[in-house]
Amino acid sequence: MHHCFHHIPKTGGSSLRIRLEDRADKKQISKLDYAVGHNTTAKTPGTHFVWLRDPLDRDISHFNYDMEKDEAQANTFEESCKLLAGNFMTLWIYKDYLLSDPTDDVETKYQSVRQALKDNFVKVFSIENFEQSWNEVADILKVDREPRLNTNRSNEDYKKYANRKNLSEEFISWHKDYNSYDYLLYEEFCT
């Protein structure tokens, strides 16, 4: 059976890929039995899994990554967020997983994504519980849970330009409003 792990940026896909590649190198699973990355879609045959992340934490991580790569839209996290469309996870799943028309209104996108998370995915995981979700994935794939490779390399790979503790309550409230559909998905499927 083919297992598809759709990776929304900054939701643990690299960590998962490193662990699966380790198990494939040890001949516990064939690389033909799974797909992990940004390019799996609703049309990819197999059982589908996805991780969501707290929207503010995901956006902070994405900003820090972009800053390190000199690809950020602005010099501060707050400025950067205000330049973006918002609801990154909703828009990503709608366009890149469902392959749907990106010009549709955001309510349509949200409702379609919500239904897809219910119907298309065997499991929607929370990145905040990655180790427990890894246990489930390892058991489904019948691969060893251990070793748990140190796969979260962000502290070593790039500097933290933005941090949740340095954000004002006013900005956090704005972020929740501006990304309301992402928060709704996260609350429904991950809390």
Q: What is each model feature region?
A:
Residues 1-191:
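Membrane-interface amphipathic segments in extracytoplasmic regions
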